[in-house]
């Protein structure tokens, strides 16, 4: 990494309540987990509590956003299913 560029992370959360994963990115995945679990994100509020199941650190925000986009794609979801079979999306609502 060069200069003042900060590392960005891609994270995967799991909701046992919804039986769904959530993929996001940011500088501090543990802080984001607390926010999601506290209901501070409208999109994930109904799945509380959330558990952090995977984190990847990338050197730039662009790299993290590309990886996040990949993990949300069909191929990326399949990769997550293979890596974390116990955390497969089950509900289709």
Which residues make up each language-model segment?
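GIY-YIG nuclease catalytic motif and its immediate N-terminal context
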Residues: 1-41, 45-51, 55-58, 62-77, ...
């Amino acid at each position: 990494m060069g200069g003042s560029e900060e590392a960005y992370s891609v994270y995967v959360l799991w909701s046992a309540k919804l039986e769904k994963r959530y993929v996001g990115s940011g500088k501090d995945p543990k802080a984001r987990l607390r926010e999601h679990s506290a209901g501070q994100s409208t999109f994930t509020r109904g799945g509380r509590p959330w558990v952090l199941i995977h984190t990847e650190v990338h050197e730039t925000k662009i790299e993290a956003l590309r990886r996040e986009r990949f993990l949300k794609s069909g191929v990326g979801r399949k990769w997550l299913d293979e890596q974390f079979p116990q955390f497969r999306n089950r509900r289709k609502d």
